[in-house]
Amino acid sequence: MSNYEIPYRKKYTLSIEEAAAYFRIGEGKLRKLVSENPNAEYLLWNGNRVQIKRERFERFVDTLSAI
């Protein structure tokens, strides 16, 4: 298996750090969104580790005028 990086735009889920870079939203703001909305449809939990479903979060952000 070769070691290569998948571009963010092709990933199904993003870590908090990756999502912060991709959406240009601070990690603190993303962590606050996660803690305030732990059952949001754009979140995927693996134990206590959260992943952000990129396309669903894009749709969520599209509905906002400010974050």
Q: What does each of the following model-derived ranges do?
A:
Residues M1-N3, T63-I67:
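Short intrinsically disordered terminal tails
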Residues Y8, R54, E58-V61:
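Intrinsically disordered, low-complexity segments enriched in glycine/proline and serine/threonine
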Residues Y22-Q51, E58, S65:
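Major-groove DNA-recognition helix of helix-turn-helix-type DNA-binding domains
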